[in-house]
């Protein structure tokens, strides 16, 4: 018995300390956060981040910048898809997971080890700026909205369109002064699904769906029985591999049946590559159905009054291109002209409109529309980090000078 007691007493430090009356809450919190504050965890996360940046940069050559961001940086895990199936196996942490762990690690390090003194105020401000930068990036990746407005001279629009996503829109045209739009994202159009619409009694039945399709003449089909969807007398859609190229866009296509109280209203084959509205009626009310790029409606309208494309003398190299637009917002009593050109965007409300491109022999402009609720956070975070460095090194410099003077 004595030998056993001595053995137990020889290693008391390895056992967790029970909270006694004299144990402070701060000490308990520090003990709880200590494993999360590990420097090894920081190094592992940074090494993993370097790996996904390296692999994602290489892979974006094949799948494009946008898809690489979704797979590697705007995801919780990287997945491996088993050949011949849709079963996905996570094999590596993604950007969201690494960012969250680094954020928790940084906060835990402060709670477990940091003791606030004026001499360390610079470090506190510096790390607070880093935390704000991580939070700002997370908010941006979740809530950022990117779209485009394509305008011909004299044309007016009150919406922008997504360059990546499409929607199936059912438009109620029964009211003379407005339209009610029911939109279904293309990602929800899965074969065999029946989607309930936010209008009483309406359902959308998906009979067939292609993630991407090529539109060809019916005479180009390998055989009459080759799987296809007929869009019209001179066009059919055949399924092809989804594209990830930067200069190409997928053309999702679907065959759908609209149901009203369980009864078929009509069946159509629709494609975003053939965005022609199909008109029909429910009772006496006129409707349209169309497959088109996803739209973001705005409280204002914008009109292209003039587009200019300046070139360097004797060449076709673009020197500058600009759009003179008129912005009208009745809700804000706004009616003014604005000039948008390279590196000179238009800021309005929570949107930024950039000059992005042109077409149609310099008669059409393409404006990039960005909505980012956290666009100021990176500036604030970088300012805090710079201030923290200045304060911290300033204190060390003052202390060094004082020691030199005394010596």
Q: In which residue ranges do the predicted regions lie?
A:
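Generic, ordered loop/turn and secondary-structure boundary motif
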Residues: 34-37, 42, 59, 74, ...
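Membrane-proximal extracellular juxtamembrane segment immediately upstream
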Residues: 62-89, 93, 339-400, 405
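A short, highly charged, low-complexity intrinsically disordered segment
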Residues: 10-14, 401-406
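Internal alpha-helical transmembrane segments
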Residues: 40, 90-177, 368-403
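Soluble non-transmembrane domains of integral membrane proteins
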Residues: 142-372
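Membrane-anchoring signal-anchor transmembrane alpha-helices and their immediate flanking context
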Residues: 2-148
């Amino acid at each position: 018995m004595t030998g056993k007691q001595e053995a137990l007493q020889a290693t008391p430090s390895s056992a967790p300390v029970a909270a006694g009356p004299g144990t402070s809450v701060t000490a308990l919190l520090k003990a709880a956060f200590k494993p999360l504050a590990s420097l090894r965890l920081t190094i592992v996360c940074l090494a993993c981040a370097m790996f996904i940046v390296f692999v994602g940069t290489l892979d974006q050559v094949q799948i494009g910048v946008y898809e690489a961001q979704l797979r590697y940086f705007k995801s919780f895990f990287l997945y491996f898809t088993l050949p011949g199936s849709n079963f996905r196996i996570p094999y590596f942490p993604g950007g969201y997971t690494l960012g969250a762990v680094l954020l928790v690690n940084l906060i835990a390090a402060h709670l477990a080890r940091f003791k606030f003194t004026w001499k360390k105020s610079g470090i506190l401000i510096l790390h607070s700026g880093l935390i704000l930068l991580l939070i700002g990036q997370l908010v941006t990746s979740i809530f950022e909205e990117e779209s485009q407005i394509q305008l011909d001279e004299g044309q007016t629009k009150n919406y922008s369109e997504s360059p990546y996503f499409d929607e199936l829109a059912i438009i109620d045209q029964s009211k003379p002064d407005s339209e009610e739009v029911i939109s279904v994202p293309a990602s929800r159009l899965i074969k065999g699904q029946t989607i309930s619409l936010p209008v009483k009694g309406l359902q959308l039945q998906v009979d067939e769906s292609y993630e991407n399709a090529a539109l060809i003449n019916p005479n180009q089909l390998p055989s009459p029985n080759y799987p296809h969807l007929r869009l019209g007398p001179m066009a059919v859609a055949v399924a092809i591999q989804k594209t990830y190229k930067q200069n190409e866009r997928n053309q999702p296509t679907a065959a759908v049946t609209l149901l009203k109280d369980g009864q078929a209203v009509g069946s159509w084959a629709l494609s975003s590559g053939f965005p022609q509205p199909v008109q029909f009626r429910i009772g006496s009310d006129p409707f349209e159905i169309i497959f088109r790029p996803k739209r973001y409606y705005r409280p204002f309208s914008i009109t292209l009054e003039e587009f200019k494309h300046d070139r360097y003398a004797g060449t076709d190299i673009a020197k500058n291109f600009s759009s003179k637009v008129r912005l009208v917002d009745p809700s804000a009593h706004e009616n003014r002209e604005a000039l948008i050109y390279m590196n000179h965007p238009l800021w309005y409300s929570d949107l930024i409109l950039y000059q992005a491109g042109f077409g149609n022999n310099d008669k059409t402009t393409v404006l990039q529309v960005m909505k980012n609720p956290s666009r100021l956070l990176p500036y604030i975070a970088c300012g805090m980090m710079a201030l923290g460095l200045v304060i911290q090194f300033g204190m060390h410099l003052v202390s060094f000078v004082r020691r030199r003077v005394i010596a």
